[in-house]
Amino acid sequence: MAAKEVLFGNDARVKMLAGVNVLANAVKVTLGPKGRNVVLDKSFGAPLITKDGVSVAKEIELEDKFENMGAQMVKEVASKANDAAGDGTTTATVLAQAIVTEGLKAVAAGMNPMDLKRGIDKAVVAAVAELKNLSQECADTNAIAQVGTISANSDETIGEIIATAMEKVGKEGVITVEEGQALENELDVVEGMQFDRGYLSPYFINKPETGSVELESPFILLVDKKVSNIRELLPILEGLAKTGKPLLIVAEDVEGEALATLVVNNMRGIVKVAAVKAPGFGDRRKAMLQDIAILTGGTVIAEEIGLELEKATLEDLGTAKRVIITKDDTTIIDGTGEQDQIQARVAQIKVQAEESTSDYDKEKLQERMAKLAGGVAVIKVGAATEVEMKEKKARVEDALHATRAAVEEGVVAGGGVALVRVASKIADVEVINEDQKHGVVIALRAMEAPLRQIATNAGEESSVVANNVKNGSGNYGYNAGNDTYGDMLEMGILDPTKVTRSALQFAASIAGLMITTEAMVGEVPQEAAGAPDMGGMGGMGGMGGMGGMM
């Protein structure tokens, strides 16, 4: 086992603080509408230019192992804030740095670290409760657009496109972000339920100009098995011929004689029909077939529940207003299922998603939920260069997370104002000694740090701005974007409550651990072994005769 180096007390804390400061100073320059860029070196390709706090934090590794421990702990703050709310990473880093700096000063002055931590924790609990009181619901499209704009570093086009996407697919809908091909951002909305399975035969195509199958008001047959014998389908096809309506078959597979007969019937115009494979595999396929059944008001024909295809009737079929099938995917528009059953299914999937421990499963469950709830929106990010594309895509993803957080827990005044107002209301938190009281004071001072940093990044004197804001009341604050003071909510400067709350809680949690650190243990660097002696190569002198090779 390698030898270890151990630092105690103040020596450990000084090293740790140095690491915290390196990381936090690199991250905090990105805060606010006038935040600066940070350029990240990449081992291949162009350097990455970003204003995303967590992207900067993830890149930082320090040579000194003890300083690096401090930096890694603050990196954890940024990562946790990002995981919980998808934004607020820079705010969390600034808060953590402020709490650690003041806390370590107090420890050096002889205060009890444990009591300081208790005081900080009490202040944070009171602050979170007060934030919830200040929070306002974020319901209308305009407020959602404003939240997105602020999170995307004041880019209004990003805020607006996210608000439009949410309006079209609903609050539960899936919104994904992709790299686009154009210079401008684009929004693609797939209404209805789409799954990635195309037609089983090109002979089903009835729209040659688009290479697709379009069925108006079709019946939909859902079968959880392979269909290869046409006799199983005859009762359904005979019933359909009388109605004159088209049929979509969704089955594990349709093959052989069954597929050939369907193609012939379709080409002769006897029955308008198309067949596709069911989406997914195994248990997920069964679940998705059930989703389609609920959406269209049909029943899944499955032998394991005692239903046979030969005995199926038109009552077992689902219906929809329209179905569009391309070679790659199928879209069912306006299924005629009962709305209360659809809502119950969405609620059931939501519970499964919350309980799931796998990110992949969670993502797939959310997709299923969105397809039932309203649709899927894809934001295609446009840019002139690859470097700009990557930077912009990261901002769009941040803004999307922030708007989801705003819809979930509401919004508070942005620009660091909410934390300043909270600090003024919780100054009299109950404590049992002077050291705890000082812990509360440390937390209250730290709550001003985001506002001060926004002002500093905008080129203003932070103390003057902080005083002006503290002298105001309610939502009165400083708009660094245009260097004015006023009501932050009226100016459209909003922060999601969840983002502000998460940033404060995670910053205080990690900072509290750092203040109460008394020793640090790291490996002693090993000297690299020297290269082997090349003395045995002396006999190579005889190579001189090689000159004749020229």
UniProtKB/Swiss-Prot annotation:
Species per Swiss-Prot/TrEMBL record: Shewanella woodyi (strain ATCC 51908 / MS32)
UniProt name for this protein: Chaperonin GroEL
HAMAP family referenced in this protein's UniProt entry, alphabetically: CH60
UniProt KW Oxidoreductase keyword: no
PANTHER family according to UniProt: 60 KDA HEAT SHOCK PROTEIN, MITOCHONDRIAL (PTHR45633)
Reaction(s) catalysed (UniProt annotation): ATP + H2O + a folded polypeptide = ADP + phosphate + an unfolded polypeptide
Assigned EC number: 5.6.1.7
Function field: Together with its co-chaperonin GroES, plays an essential role in assisting protein folding. The GroEL-GroES system forms a nano-cage that allows encapsulation of the non-native substrate proteins and provides a physical environment optimized to promote and accelerate protein folding.
Subunit structure of this chain's protein: Forms a cylinder of 14 subunits composed of two heptameric rings stacked back-to-back. Interacts with the co-chaperonin GroES.
Localization, UniProt: Cytoplasm
One GO term of the biological process aspect: protein refolding
Keyword terms, alphabetized: ATP-binding, Chaperone, Cytoplasm, Isomerase, Nucleotide-binding
GO MF terms held by the record: ATP binding; ATP-dependent protein folding chaperone; isomerase activity; unfolded protein binding
Record's GO cellular component terms: cytoplasm
Positions bound to ATP: 30-33, 51, 87-91, 415, 495
Keyword Repeat: no
